A protein has these predicted regions:
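Nucleotidyltransferase catalytic core that binds NTPs
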Residues: 1-182
């Protein structure tokens, strides 16, 4: 298991399955994504990597404290349990926040990581002012040689299971619901 602080990956970690997100709390919705990645790992004999950000962009922009559901060490343990081979723990700062969505795809994903598969959730946004989304990533698959994998979101009744939903239920003291989502 390897932890990178930047996007300069070793050769063996390039051309992998990449999951991108904050993965705070690694709830059941995340677990669905990781299970699908595990199946791809077995089927295609590829390594699995995670790109995550520190701090969580929302924490950075809104100056939030006590916002996380899991700390970095807890995340590492959860990733290891979910067949992840390496992570890129990218520092999220002003400089990184100004990278355009197109530069993120070309200069980071294509030039440095060269993923075969990119796993993201429906609400994934990236790049300066969150301009990039799953539609943009899909539209550039052929240009950059990756395939987007986007499993349908996991729902509990009518709600999509998300870290935001878990935080709201924690704030309201709905611990039974929180336990059901994790």
């Amino acid at each position: 298991f390897r932890i990178y602080k930047n996007f300069n990956l070793s050769k063996k970690d390039k051309e992998a399955i990449i999951l991108i997100g904050n993965f705070d709390g690694l709830h059941r919705g995340h677990q669905k994504l990781f299970n699908k990645a595990k199946n791809f790992k077995k089927k295609f004999k590829l390594r699995v990597g995670v790109i995550t950000f520190d701090p969580i962009p929302k924490m950075f922009f809104k100056k939030l404290h006590n916002y996380r559901l899991s700390n970095f060490d807890q995340k590492i343990q959860l990733f290891k349990k979910n067949y992840v081979d390496f992570i890129v723990n990218q520092k999220f700062d002003i400089k990184f926040s100004k990278i355009s969505c197109f530069d993120f795809i070309k200069k980071i994903l294509f030039n440095k990581i060269k993923p075969k598969y990119i796993f993201v959730s429906d609400n994934f946004r990236f790049g300066y002012k969150r301009a990039g989304d799953i539609k943009l990533l899909k539209s550039l698959e052929k240009n950059y040689g990756y395939k987007i994998i986007n499993p349908s979101p996991l729902k509990s009744k009518k709600f999509v299971i998300s870290s935001t939903l878990i935080r709201k239920n924690l704030e309201m003291g709905n611990l039974k619901k929180v336990k059901k989502f994790l």
